[in-house]
Regions:
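NAD(P)-cofactor binding segment of oxidoreductase domains
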Residues: 62-102, 136
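N-terminal Rossmann-fold NAD(P) dinucleotide-binding loop
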Residues: 13-14
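C-terminal amphipathic/interface module of NAD(P)-dependent oxidoreductases
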Residues: 50-54, 247-284
Length: 284
């Protein structure tokens, strides 16, 4: 039975466990410890592996590795500590550097902000510290594992992962520009794409991962409000000089045609209209 190790098994990683198990993989997933987290991973069918990049040890041998590391706000670590330095520590803990490696990155590496259509050949010129860190992580991994596949995820949505739900239900105005572009991928579809690439041993790829249906932010929240039975959203502009919120600066259209050619048939949610109802079932 082939073995896959997930380094950083959070919201997306938990879904990947099921997708990999369904494809006949033995799945191992790292955790820094704690009974609740260990029990959670075991309940999903993964073998928990204790690993902390601040006190590193060795990681078990596997046929494939998926790195999907994210910052735990309670850890006191910075984004760079985890995404760059932590990734380097993880690579060094792997016994065989020839292992197939799949890295979950982000479309934040692109800096386009004027509605441009962006594919994998577009220049990476991030405009904020987060994007710079994510790009540095990609570069660090490729310097250590040249054959690694880089997966640049658009915004991940899914159950318990929808912003502004409370504001919509309360009828509060939303701050920002409803005409800015939004790029999305349902969590379960993202997990299926990664698992399919692992199974197909698609090494050395660079892929954007989205549903390939860019939408205006306003349209997304209008649909959310409709499903919630909430008032149609009202928008108010940002104040001059007000810092951008998370992901609000983004205003580009992600082209994921390359990914769709490899794994597009696996997508269950072709756009937000098909994906949102299941995400909001608990609010019905």
């Amino acid at each position: 039975m082939p073995r896959c190790l997930i380094i950083g098994c959070g919201y997306l990683g938990e879904a990947m466990v099921g997708s990999l198990l369904a494809r006949g993989y033995e799945v191992m997933a790292t955790t820094r410890g704690g009974a609740s987290r260990t029990e959670r991973l075991a309940s999903l069918g993964a073998t928990p592996v204790l690993f902390d990049t601040r006190a590193p040890g060795n990681l078990p041998a596997s046929d494939a590795v998926i790195s999907a590391m994210a910052v735990d706000r309670t850890s006191g670590q910075t984004m760079r500590d985890v995404h760059v330095d932590g990734l380097r520590v993880a690579v060094n803990a792997i016994p065989d550097k020839r292992v197939a490696w799949f890295h979950v990155s982000s479309t934040s590496v692109y800096g386009q902000e004027h509605g441009e259509l962006v594919n994998e050949e577009s220049p990476c010129e991030p405009t904020d510290a987060s994007g710079h860190t994510v790009l540095e992580a990609e570069q660090t991994l490729k310097s250590l594992i040249p054959h690694a596949t880089i997966l640049r995820f658009a915004g991940i949505y899914g159950p318990q992962r929808l912003m502004r739900t409370a504001a919509l239900m309360a009828g509060d105005p939303l701050r920002g520009d409803p005409e800015r572009w939004l790029n999305l991928i349902h969590r379960d579809d993202g997990a299926e794409v990664v698992a399919a690439l692992v199974t197909g041993n698609q090494q050395g790829q660079l892929l954007n991962v989205s549903d390939n249906q860019p939408i205006h932010r306003g349209d997304f929240y209008v649909e959310m409000a409709r499903l919630l039975g909430a008032p149609t959203p009202r928008w108010i502009p940002r104040n001059p000089g007000e810092p951008w919120g998370p992901h609000e600066r983004n205003n580009r259209r992600i082209d994921s045609s390359r990914m769709l050619a490899l794994a597009g048939s696996l997508l269950s949610y072709r756009d937000y209209r098909s994906g949102l109802p299941g995400c909001l079932a608990d609010h019905g």
